[in-house]
Design a protein with these regions (language model features):
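Bacterial Sec-dependent N-terminal signal peptides
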Residues: 1-29
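Hydrophobic alpha-helical and helix-loop surface patches within well-folded domains
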Residues: 2, 22-23, 68, 91, ...
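Non-catalytic accessory/interaction domains
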Residues: 170-173, 237, 322, 386-389, ...
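Ligand-binding face of N-terminal immunoglobulin V-set domains in extracellular IgSF glycoproteins
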Residues: 65-86
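N-terminal, polar/Ser/Thr-rich
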Residues: 18-65, 92, 136-141, 159-161, ...
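Extended, low-hydrophobicity, Ser/Thr/Pro/Gly-biased non-transmembrane segments
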Residues: 32, 125-223, 461, 546-550, ...
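A surface-exposed beta-strand-loop module
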Residues: 85-142, 194, 521-534
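Short coil-to-beta strand junction motifs in C2/discoidin
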Residues: 85-90, 163, 493-500
């Protein structure tokens, strides 16, 4: 406890002790941000404002200094519990209403007893030293990334999404640096210290703390204008061909803003929209109002990008822009509902990109984007509901995953079909108007949408949103009828209401049948319009609008493969690819048959979305069910050298690179890398050559050091050079060096740039190192709680995926089993992350 500049310490200590007892009894100041504390503050605190100052030295070895003036109103005398995840020595001083007062730094909070606060307006001033973790400091720049509960690591605050506040910011930075934040720059002054500038920013609109943001550093700025609106793009790129993409990026931001303004009927609700494109950024993007962050990996495309890469960038921009309305303007009340912002961002992103790509089958693209990713977690023993319980924001990052990002848009599309497009739009507009600059819940949205339909949306939501998993759906022809049955594989007796479409083919007869699975029935029967004669081929979910495991047998799969090869219906083929792959993963069809059929299908597929799906599924099959690589190498190299579509050649080359094992294949790749001469009509990028260098260093240990040194000398961009220097030791031919890299990754400070750390861990656990790297599994799993505590929201999943994805051995499975046996009470949400990524071992 700090009792600076206070008279009567003995009397005071008694008062504070008494107050502390009251606080402990209330159970409010536990570590993290508990739900009880959040509700308490929301009930008693209001009109919160932050006036923040940070002095940022040029060297990241020097500490940043911060000050915050926090003003608020209290409706009665209550303890003031301010979130700050720091140590006692990081808090330099605290004053309340202009006077020094006693305070306590404990359990990740600064606590001021109720004796010292006033009813009505209070003003707290705190001088502090922020932790570097969420400041993401590099040598020449830094950026804040505070979602979901990391604002409290950077400054003292009320770090909960429903305490929306106004922020004013001042930064003191080196004069050669640029700075950008949520608000526009109002003033830039030089300071009394040479080479330093003081930059002041305009007060923001009401924001949740996780949306507060600033970026400072050596950045290049571009400006673009359309219809009276300006957008600044900040970046660190040095490649002129990549910088030349900035106008196209700005155009897509403008397009997304205009689309949402038209759909919602609400003009862009914030003062500005700036884009900051950063190397090594942890996510695809982050929707900070006025200062939206993007990763350079997805924004600056290679010279000859694939359709997938172009769609990915457009979808990312549309996703983050949609968040301005869904997440920023209207924000979830608590992070158990974080999916309500992600569902809208992804659902609307799929619609916003449609007019940008008129030649793309967007129904197919929707299926391809969301359903496989959702199944990848929903089929596992680590599956979770879309909406999950959350009692403390310290665990909020574990709520994130493919279920909330990818299953939720599929469910939202079902909801739109139930409501109808016009009613859905009316309901969304009412939702945004009702909760403008405020907070909402899924239940609140459902109450609004219920006005526009006679369907029981609450009952529908209970199964699709509040329960985990998916139905197992089978179909057969019996006595001239199509019989479709659903089963809850988890034995809960759940019934998922949904509309499906089947096609039954018997010889020359064919019929398309709508199937309605009701919430009160496990089966559906319909008489066929023709008399079945012999074996029938039953095609499930032909429009891809259903969700579940559409179970087939090995014998039934031959009919699906035949239709896949012969059909011209792109959506049907996409749905069949998913069905066949899911049956591979559920082990109802054989890997050998899957490989052979896929290799026969791929050379003849001209649709780029279907080709990339099939190639990805083939790659997964080869990874999970290893086999002799030589015939596969030959088949893939034939695609690389003969396919008429250049991007198909490039995608096939990347899979060829990952599976190459034979001496001939490795030597071919080495010559290609050494001479920098790509196969005809298969243009390779710098990142392709970097990936080749890692792969060749592992295959050719006697040449590894020279390969790495040569590749490093070829890289010109300073940020990419630093990335390569960090990752390349993970492919060392010397086990002692690799062990040293692994040991270093167990230290939080060495995981600061999370994409680099993930890549290094993946290299350490490459399939070529599988026997040696089994030893890494237990210690890396033991580190998961610390990885979660010190990492950002997607990092625990990235960590365990990098650790386990290349392992297929019995020994690896035994390591995972032994870990769970040793930790029977391991946190459920963290356990699920492991189980999701380990499912292929079982």
């Amino acid at each position: 406890m700090n009792l600076k500049v206070f008279i009567g310490a003995c009397v005071l200590s008694g008062l504070v002790a008494c107050s502390s007892v009251k606080q402990d009894e209330a159970g409010l100041s536990r570590p993290g941000v508990g739900l009880e504390l959040a509700r308490f503050r929301k009930e008693h605190f209001s009109d919160v404002r932050y006036n923040l100052f940070f002095s940022i030295p040029e060297s990241r070895d020097e500490a940043i200094r911060g000050k915050v003036e926090l003003s608020l109103r209290l409706d009665e005398k209550q303890p003031l519990i301010i979130d700050f995840r720091g140590e006692q020595e990081q808090v330099t001083s605290v004053t309340l209403n202009g006077g020094d007062i006693p305070y306590e730094v404990k359990d990740e909070h600064i606590v001021i007893a109720s004796d010292w606060v006033a009813v009505g307006e209070n003003r707290v001033a705190i001088a502090f030293t922020p932790a570097d973790q969420s400041l993401n400091r590099r040598d020449e720049f830094l950026y804040t990334l505070l979602v979901p509960d990391r604002a409290r690591t950077v400054f003292p605050c009320f770090d909960q999404p429903d305490m929306k506040s106004l922020f004013t910011l001042t930064l003191e930075v080196p004069s050669t640096w640029q700075a950008v934040a949520n608000g526009a720059i109002t003033q830039t002054d030089s300071t009394s210290v040479s080479g330093r500038n003081r930059i002041s920013f305009k007060e923001t609109e009401p924001l949740s703390t996780y949306l507060f943001s600033f970026v400072a550093g050596e950045l290049t700025r571009e400006v673009y204008s359309r219809n009276g609106r300006d957008i600044f793009i900040y970046h660190r790129e040095t490649d002129p061909k990549k910088i030349a993409q900035c106008p196209a990026i700005a155009d897509e931001v403008f397009d997304a803003l205009e689309w949402q303004e038209d759909f919602t009927g609400i003009p862009y609700p914030f003062a500005k929209y700036d884009v900051i494109i950063l190397p090594g950024f942890q996510y695809g993007g982050m929707e900070h109002t006025g200062a939206t962050l993007y990763t350079d990996r997805r924004m600056f495309l290679d010279e000859h990008p694939t359709l997938n890469e172009r769609l990915s960038r457009s979808s990312l921009i549309a996703h983050e822009t949609s968040h301005m309305w869904f997440g920023d303007y209207v924000t979830m009340k608590w992070f158990d509902d974080v999916w309500t912002k992600e569902v809208f961002a992804n659902y609307f992103a799929s619609r916003i990109v449609e007019p940008l790509y008129p030649d793309v089958n967007h129904r197919l693209n929707f299926i391809r984007d969301y359903i496989p990713a959702s199944y990848s977690e929903d089929r596992t023993s680590g599956a979770n509901p879309i909406k999950q319980d959350l009692d403390n924001l310290r665990n909020a990052g574990l709520v994130y995953g493919n279920i909330i990002y990818d299953k939720s848009p599929v469910v939202m599309e079902m909801l739109v079909r139930v409501l109808g497009e016009e009613a859905f739009q009316q309901g969304i507009r009412e939702y945004l108007t009702t909760y403008a600059y405020g907070n909402a819940t899924w239940e609140g949205l459902i109450r609004i949408l219920n006005k526009y339909t006679e369907e029981d949306l609450a009952a529908w939501s209970e199964v699709w949103v509040n329960q985990k998993g998916m139905p197992e759906i089978t179909a057969s022809v019996k006595d001239g009828e199509l019989v479709v049955e659903q089963r809850d594989p988890l034995g809960r007796g759940l019934k998922w209401p949904q509309e499906l479409t089947y096609r039954v083919i018997c010889g020359t007869d064919s019929e398309e049948i709508p199937v309605s699975l009701e919430g009160n029935s496990d089966s559906f029967r319909m008489k066929l319009s023709f008399l079945p004669n012999g074996n029938c081929v039953i095609l499930p979910n032909i429009n891809g609008r259903g969700y579940g495991f559409f179970k087939i047998t090995e014998g039934e799969s031959s009919g699906l493969w035949s239709v896949l090869r012969s059909s011209e219906d792109e959506v049907l083929k996409g749905s069949l690819l998913i069905t066949l792959y899911e049956n591979l993963r559920w082990k109802t069809i054989s890997p050998q048959g899957f490989r052979e059929e896929m290799l026969a299908y791929l050379p003849n597929e001209s649709n780029s979305l279907l080709f990339s799906m099939a190639l990805s599924y083939l790659g997964d099959c080869l990874r999970i069910f290893p086999s002799d690589s030589c015939p596969l190498e030959e088949a893939l190299w034939k695609i690389v050298t003969t396919n008429p579509v250049s991007q198909h050649r490039l995608q096939a080359f990347r899979l060829y690179r990952s599976i190459a094992d034979s001496e001939e294949a490795v030597q071919r790749l080495y010559t290609l890398w050494q001479e920098r001469k790509a196969p005809k009509d298969c243009t390779l990028s710098e990142s392709d050559y970097i990936g080749l260098s890692y792969m060749l260093a592992m295959h050719l240990p006697e040449k590894a050091d020279k390969i790495i040194a040569t590749q490093l000398s070829r890289i010109q961009n300073p940020d990419r050079k630093k990335e390569y220097q960090f990752i390349s030791p993970s492919v060392s031919p010397r086990k002692a060096e690799r062990d040293s890299v692994f040991a270093s990754l167990l230290i939080a400070g060495n995981r600061r740039v999370e994409p680099w750390a993930s890549s290094a861990l993946a290299n350490l656990n490459h399939r070529l190192r599988e026997q040696e790297s089994v030893a890494y599994i237990r210690p890396a799993l033991e580190a998961m709680p610390e990885v979660q505590r010190t990492g950002d929201i997607f990092f625990p999943t990235a960590w365990v995926r990098s650790l386990l994805s290349a392992h297929t051995s019995k020994e690896a499975r035994e390591e995972v089993d032994a870990f769970f046996t040793a930790h029977p009470d391991f946190p459920l949400m963290l356990s699920n992350k492991i189980k999701q990524q380990a499912s292929h071992l079982y």
